[in-house]
Design a protein with these regions (language model features):
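Active-site mouth loops of central-metabolism enzymes
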Residues: 17-24, 76-90, 108-110, 138-142, ...
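Short coil/turn connectors at secondary-structure junctions
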Residues: 74-77, 101-102, 128-129, 183-184, ...
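Flexible C-terminal active-site loop/helix
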Residues: 1-29, 40-45, 64-67, 72, ...
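Catalytic core of soluble alpha/beta enzymes
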Residues: 107-110, 114-249, 254, 273-281
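Short, charged beta->alpha transition segments
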Residues: 65-68, 81-97, 110, 117-122
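Catalytic domains of carbohydrate-active enzymes, especially glycoside hydrolases
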Residues: 40-43, 95-110
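Short beta-strand elements
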Residues: 30-35
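Mid-domain alpha/beta scaffold segments of enzyme catalytic cores
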Residues: 41-89
Length: 325
């Protein structure tokens, strides 16, 4: 199956989904949807991304619109809770209640070690047996990362600290960090992979222990599976804050990975006031299926005509950068 630019633009819908809590600094998630022979697809690069960085996101959406995938290894995916950079104990407890049955929590950190320790301690107070992941988004310098990871491990997390996601920005920094860390903590790589011009060319040895796979920024399910096979590391499938349409593509990726040892970060739909479809979390897991999009919600959350035109122009510009265009 294939799809043309004209077909994409003809079926294009843009929605603005309000969030229950700020995440990544935003309270409204704007995203574009279009239809192909295989159903709805999502194109959702954040608005600040330049056109070239958006190309793999468009390739993933085209794949979703034109390809039918069967569940290969599992029909349900264990997921983690996600706690934004909030220090309010009541809010943290409320956020965790949106993820029934999860036994793993990903916590955004990097706002300051004092605040980070408080946030992690509050999560552990509410879910004392949960595995903890912290996500730094590459914001620490090496010296800070060494100190902060040792401190977090020693004071609040201990062996419950499953891994630290992208603590520093570059591969060289990640290698140096692993050499200097005294505590036995795994390091996961996210931005270092998905922001690389050629992620297949990266030498990840001695730099990371876990590979984060985000289906849209990596160009789709097929390319993500190829990357996982190439780098031969344990993987976690995670979201890029998509609606249920994009999340379902991530769930299909997770179902296609033979060995999946970690809970996946695909439950971020819980952060929306309402999603375009219902993807429930049951006993800490989500089912792999094609969501039924609610037409009423498509209308209710429709973006303004000006924003629709902005996305039309964006898709047209990105389409021209595709290698097959």
């Amino acid at each position: 199956m294939s799809i043309t630019l004209e077909e994409v633009l003809t079926s294009l819908r843009v929605v603005a989904l309000p969030m229950k809590t700020k995440f990544r600094g935003i309270s409204i998630r704007e995203t574009a949807l279009f239809r192909g022979d295989a159903g709805w697809a999502e194109f959702a690069p954040f608005v600040e991304y330049d056109p070239r960085e958006c190309v793999p996101w468009l390739e993933s959406a085209i794949e979703e619109a034109t390809t039918n995938f069967d569940n290969q290894y599992r029909s349900t995916i264990a997921v983690n809770a996600t706690v934004p950079a909030s220090d309010d104990e009541v809010e943290i407890e409320k956020i965790l209640s949106w993820y029934p049955g999860v036994d793993t929590v990903k916590i955004k950190v990097g706002t300051g070690i004092k605040e980070d320790l408080i946030r992690i301690a509050r999560v552990r107070k509410i879910l004392p047996s949960a595995k903890i992941r912290i996500d730094v988004n590459g914001s620490w310098k090496i010296d800070d990362a060494v100190f902060n990871i040792r401190t977090i491990y020693g004071e609040v997390a201990g062996n419950f600290l499953e891994y630290v996601e992208q603590p520093v920005a570059t591969l060289d920094e990640l290698r140096e960090l692993k050499e200097r860390l005294i505590v036995d903590v795994k390091i996961a790589g996210d931005e270092v992979l998905r922001k690389a011009s050629n992620p297949f060319a990266l030498d990840l040895s001695g730099a990371i222990d876990v590979l984060m796979l985000k289906v849209a920024p990596l160009g789709g399910i097929k390319r993500s599976l190829e990357l996982a096979a190439h780098h031969k590391l344990p993987v976690v499938v995670s979201s890029a804050l998509e609606s249920a349409v994009g999340i379902s593509h991530g769930l299909r990726l997770a179902s296609a990975i033979e060995k999946l040892d970690y809970a996946c970060g695909l439950a971020t739909g819980a952060l929306f006031e309402e999603d375009l479809a219902t993807l429930p979390i049951n006993n800490g897991a989500m089912s792999v299926n094609t969501p039924v999009i609610d037409d009423e919600r498509l209308e209710r959350f429709a973006a303004t005509p000006e924003r629709l035109e902005w996305w039309r122009n964006r898709i047209t510009e990105v389409w021209k950068l595709r290698r097959r265009a």
